[in-house]
Amino acid sequence: MLGKIIAKLFGSRNERIIKQLSKTVKKINALEESMIALDDAALRAKTDEFRKRLTEGETLDDVLPEAFAVVREAAKRVLGLRHYDVQLIGGMVLHQGKIAEMRTGEGKTLVATLAVYLNALSGEGVHVVTVNDYLAKRDGGELGKLYSFLGLTTGIIVSGMDTEEKKAAYRADITYGTNSEFGFDYLRTNMALSPDQRLQRKLNFAIVDEVDSILIDEARTPLIISGPAEMNTELYRKLNELVPYLTLQKKDPNQEKRSLLNDEEEIETGDFSIDEKTKQVGLTEMGHAHIEKLLVEKGLIAENESLYEPKNIGLFHHLNACLRAHHLYHRDVDYIVKDGQVMIVDEFTGRTLAGRRWSDGLHQAIEIKEGVTVQQESQTLASITYQNFFRMYEKLSGMTGTADTEAYEFQDIYNLETVVIPTNRPIARIDYTDMIFLKQSGKYQAIVAEVKECLARRQPVLLGTASIETSELISDLLTKEGVAHNVLNAKQHAREAEIVANAGLPGQITIATNMAGRGTDIVLGGSLKAELDKLGADATEEEKAAVQEAWQKRHDEVIAAGGLHVIGAERHESRRIDNQLRGRSGRQGDPGSSRFYVALDDNLVRIFAGDRMAGMMERLGMGENDVIESKMVSRQIEGAQRKVEAHNFDARKHLLEYDDVANEQRKVIYNQRSVIMDAENIREMLDEMRESIVTRLITHYVPADQVRQNWEVAGLEAALLNEFGLSIAVEKEWLAKEPDLSVDEIQKRLLAAFNAIDAQKRAQYGDDMMDWAGKYVALQIIDELWKGHLATMDMLRQAIWLRSRAQKDPKREYQRESYELFIDLLANIQLQIVRLLNHITFNAPNAESTATAAEPAPEASQSQSTNDATASQNPPITEVEASKVGRNQPCPCGSGKKYKHCCGKL
């Protein structure tokens, strides 16, 4: 109540921000006449003037009014477009590192040019992030003309480019690209083996287009560069054959009530249960016993073994994936099968996600289910989430048509404030109340009837669905009624530009899966620009005028019919996606309308609002084809959407809390790699590593606080020989001859022995060769051990929830154990680097191509959206034969302990 009173007196925070920025708009407008008076060369010279002023101590805010005025005038000359006042406000919001919410058709692409130009003046680079390659090419190409006119360079990053092309694009003042390519290139940059292999510069400033799609919808999708891993395809096939024998648990609501009233234990009636909200599967006690029996029959486990024994965890993992594949992931909803491949469908945009694969064996399980070729499982070499990648930019901002519903999440996770920018013209779209049906069959009949009504008055219709399955079902119904229409979904994405360009034609019916992120406005009367482009450069003015006249007639006809009518065939889980669909109509003050159709057996209502609502309507006598327009029911449906949004927000925040732990470790590792790569040589670093290893050897085997009888001298000698190739008779040569030899003296002699090996190799092969080998070995070892650490962290994260059974906080336990693992990793990196360099030999002096060893550091292959193996420019180093001891074998020192608990503990 108090907040409302304050808002009435002083205006909301959003209104105050707009009012404050409007003062700067007046300054920019006052400069317009002086900019018009400048010729092209003088306008271009302003860029150099601004850069000079910045070097002399002025800030970007100081030059903002004049810089924005320059961009506005340049856009008029190059693009034929003039920034509106509200677009200037949007540009300032982006420059301030905030999110600008601008309605569809308000010119977000043009708004970005203001903040892009201003921030590019610093010379530190600006990244403009789009949702697909098409938009990156389109915007980078068209707006690149504007930036070039003003003396700035523009680069475009798309998948499939070679390293040199990407390096050039990143060194441009402004770089356009997709969110995934920027993220993958960050990982590739930090997997480089030499400075000239790096792609990116410092992450300075990014403007994210469709920011809600990338930072919220994609937040739980990790970017992973992976290499091949071992996989047992036959195991998946055998487990897949078991699925039909397992029954899904169906709960009896009456039994549930009796259990609650009588405090009785609920009787389980199936082998497994599913949770459609979280897409997870759980085994019942009955199912556990049944599955073990089936596994014994298949010969997958022994007679008396349990599914939960450590060695069978892999079986359980694969079986879980098979059950999820059959019962929670559906063809033409979650994925499509095309050209013998299972392709994921983005639930928010309806696009296929080329190159993306589900993890945890799920993708392989779906491939088995669909009978297509099973592709190899992968092992993570490097990964990062979008959340942590974009938070690394010094300044981040974004644009979207629908951010206000997620404003709290943007503020809480990314520290980004959302500012709603006023529209240039008032919105004329009419949003009708939802039409609510008992069953989907009645809903679809009503949708077809409304489409036919619109067609009769030649009003274009955009019919939005949440899945390919629904889009094809409605398409079949319209075909039976003889209604011509276009379908835009993941299966027809090749015709996307053509379908969207024609969606505003009189009487045009377009069915589309989620239109979020399509990036192209639906123009009433069709796309005039597309028609003029078809004429080509040789077209006469008369031909252009004829096309313009024909378009104007169609445009007026559509406006007379009521503009674009949007029909939502179902409510999406997120209100934001519904708003994006609505926003396709009524652009730039055009007329339009929207209406959603909801059935009480739609997935959203059924899963999150329960059967209570449907039961109540049936008792009131509502039939399948009856329809109601009830604000109460609509509020309940919105309540269900809020539940889903809250659930998804919690999931994203939970993921971030865990990923933050890995992110801090990632920063340390990548910084260490960067220091090694940039150093002329790492002799000092290697000296410190040898000293650290000797200290650990002493502490472990001959600790100063223990009497000599408790020292493990044999273990020390074995570790020196097996790990580092040092044959030192500590007992016979040192301690037997010098009984009073101190621990400090032993430490000095051991360090001298390590340094002697390095000196010997430098004398033999030369400093240059050993300096190169030191850097190369260090980078390879870091990459190899980091890869294993990522796998261990992933397993820890999957299992850590079990700590809650012991009344422990899983998050704290994860933080504690991951820290211990990381300390072990850093120690092991030092050990392996020194160990390998002690054993390294070269067949010929100063011939880097002839280095040999016994354990080659594996070459990193990168695969996700592409399988672009980054081959090292230097030859792989292999290691000389040294004695090998298995981790679980008895330690050769004779202690009687396992090697991993003795000499291998280092």
Swiss-Prot record:
Compartments annotated for it: namely: Cell inner membrane; Cytoplasm
* Annotated positions binding Zn(2+): C891, C893, C902, C903
Q: Ranges of Polar residues compositional bias? A: 866-876
**What EC number(s) does its UniProt record assign?**
7.4.2.8
Its required cofactor(s), as named, are: Zn(2+)
UniProt keywords, alphabetically: ATP-binding, Cell inner membrane, Cell membrane, Cytoplasm, Membrane, Metal-binding, Nucleotide-binding, Protein transport, Translocase, Translocation, Transport, Zinc
Q: How is the cofactor bound?
A: May bind 1 zinc ion per subunit.
Where do the record's region annotations for Disordered lie?
A: 849-897
The protein's matches in CDD domains, at most eight in alphabetical order, are given as: DEXDc_SecA, SF2_C_secA
Q: Name one GO molecular function term.
A: ATP binding
The main place the protein resides is membrane
Chemical reaction(s) catalysed: ATP + H2O + cellular proteinSide 1 = ADP + phosphate + cellular proteinSide 2
* Biased segments, Low complexity type: 849-865
Asked if the keyword Cytoplasm belongs to this entry, the reply reads yes
Binding sites annotated in the UniProt record for ATP: Q87, G105, E106, G107, K108, T109, D521
Membrane topology, as annotated:
Peripheral membrane protein
The record, for NCBIfam families, names: PRK12904.1, secA
Family listed = Belongs to the SecA family.
Assembly behavior: Monomer and homodimer. Part of the essential Sec protein translocation apparatus which comprises SecA, SecYEG and auxiliary proteins SecDF-YajC and YidC.
> What's the protein called, per UniProt?
Protein translocase subunit SecA
Gene designation per UniProt:
secA
